[in-house]
Amino acid sequence: MASACWAAAEFQRIKEEIEAYARSHGFAKNVKATIEARGLVIRVLTDDLLFASGQATLQGRADGLLSEIAQLLNVDETHPISVEGNTDDVPIHSSQFPSNWELSTTRASTVVRFLIGHGVSPIRLTASGNAEQRPVDSNATAAGRARNRRVEIVMRRIHAAAGEGESEP
């Protein structure tokens, strides 16, 4: 139980630091951190910050933010981290990205490589792409589509095994 309390407090501290960094660097509209059942979720809208439209190469503006996130994720090296790429429902058909599946997966992998390059242990990381399958908003409007184009970095909760942490009578 003590480790669960520690994790909750640590997630809250990291959340607050990410939000403060985003505010102080003008990214508050693009970066949101929430604590959910699956863990600490850092949502970064990709437009004008991480990637150009239809691309998976990090833009220069992303370096400071992702460096800060990497540093904060390294405070506790026990929690696994998943990086999930998401797109809107506008189809992409390029030689590099035949569909949104390839684009979202490549964007997640690009962020994973950045985090590894900034000290996050690769054993903690996974990358996945959701294409347009997990929207957080409607794809009917430009604003909704922009919110769906995102990368989520999830510092996952560690669930105790059955009986772990329980004392014997």
Language-model segment annotations:
Residues 29-31, 40, 79-81, 123-125:
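Residue-level recognition of the N-termini of beta-strands and the immediately preceding loop/turn
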Residues 43-45, 82-87:
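Glycine- and acidic-rich phosphate- and metal-coordinating loops
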Residues 1-40, 44-50, 161-169:
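Juxtamembrane linker/hinge segments adjacent to a transmembrane helix in small membrane proteins
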